[in-house]
Amino acid sequence: MTIKEELGQPQSHSIELDEVSKEAASTRAALTSNLSGRFDQYPTKKGDFAIDGYLLDYSSPKQGCWVDGITVYGDIYIGKQNWGTYTRPVFAYLQYVETISIPQNVTTTLSYQLTKGHTRSFETSVNAKYSVGANIDIVNVGSEISTGFTRSESWSTTQSFTDTTEMKGPGTFVIYQVVLVYAHNATSAGRQNANAFAYSKTQAVGSRVDLYYLSAITQRKRVIVPSSNAVTPLDWDTVQRNVLMENYNPGSNSGHFSFDWSAYNDPHRRY
């Protein structure tokens, strides 16, 4: 049964981070604090063309970028039931796949493993039963984003598959795959599921407590670059800390991104 939200803009209340998240975040702070400013300097891109053009530069790949897009509203299953949830894309980044060496001056076929669906790092960071229906993909359609997979594959559990590419040696090459990050506001889910995610925020709105968190899925897009052009990849902890914890305030629905609450009353943005 879906929990129906109480209409109205979020009001000013204190932001709560569950105790488990506080402890985990504090131990990682030293490792990620130097990236906080960098995240604020990443550009914002909208749609596949702009995102790909920025991230997938063979001569100079980029770590990540903010993503603009629409907000949609529908059910997401967390813990023991469905929750009415606002969802929008907020970030994209390159995930490290593999380093491969070609020792001779020959053209060879490289074989490597990519993934589809939610990322492994997201799945292992969730401490509750979690599932999303394929119809949530209207968020990508409306944001001019295509994953390269079917809707069901895109929002399912992680699956590996083999991809191949011809490359000429000699040389060492680094492979990255594109990850899309989404922000969610699961309305009324904060009391029951505050410990469901490694990083989350809760916000009181009237009698309900909303839960804010991030999820991540992969695109069927990769870039292979010489090791001399390699970029230090972001990890899921760093992304969550900097995108959600450092750059979004649920009390004012502001920061580096915001939700469009009007999706609740728009049949074209509900699933």
Swiss-Prot record:
- What InterPro entries is this protein classified in? BB_PF
**Keyword annotations from UniProtKB, A to Z:** Cytolysis, Hemolysis, Host cell membrane, Host membrane, Ion transport, Membrane, Porin, Secreted, Toxin, Transmembrane, Transmembrane beta strand, Transport, Virulence, Zymogen
From the UniProt record, list the coiled-coil ranges: none
Q: Which SUPFAM superfamilies match?
A: Aerolisin/ETX pore-forming domain
Q: Name the residues of the propeptide.
A: 1-33
Q: What is this protein called?
A: Monalysin
Disruption-associated phenotype: Reduced cell death is observed upon infection with a mutant deficient in Monalysin production. This mutant is affected in its abilities to induce cell damage in the Drosophila gut. It induces lower level of stress and repair pathway activity than wild-type.
Induction per UniProt is:
Is regulated by both the GacS/GacA two-component system and the Pvf regulator, two signaling systems that control P.entomophila pathogenicity.
Where does this polypeptide localize?
Answer: Secreted; Host cell membrane
Gene Ontology, cellular component aspect: extracellular region; host cell plasma membrane; pore complex
Assembly information from the UniProt record? Pro-Monalysin forms a stable donut-like 18-mer complex composed of two disk-shaped nonamers held together by N-terminal swapping of the pro-peptides. After proteolytic cleavage, the inactive 18-mer complex probably dissociates into two disk-shaped active nonamers in which the transmembrane segments are unmasked and ready to engage the conformational change leading to the pore formation into the target membrane. Multimerizes into circular-like structures and barrel-like aggregates.
Q: Output the PTM entry.
A: Requires N-terminal cleavage to become fully active. The metalloprotease AprA can induce the rapid cleavage of pro-Monalysin into its active form. Can also be processed by trypsin.
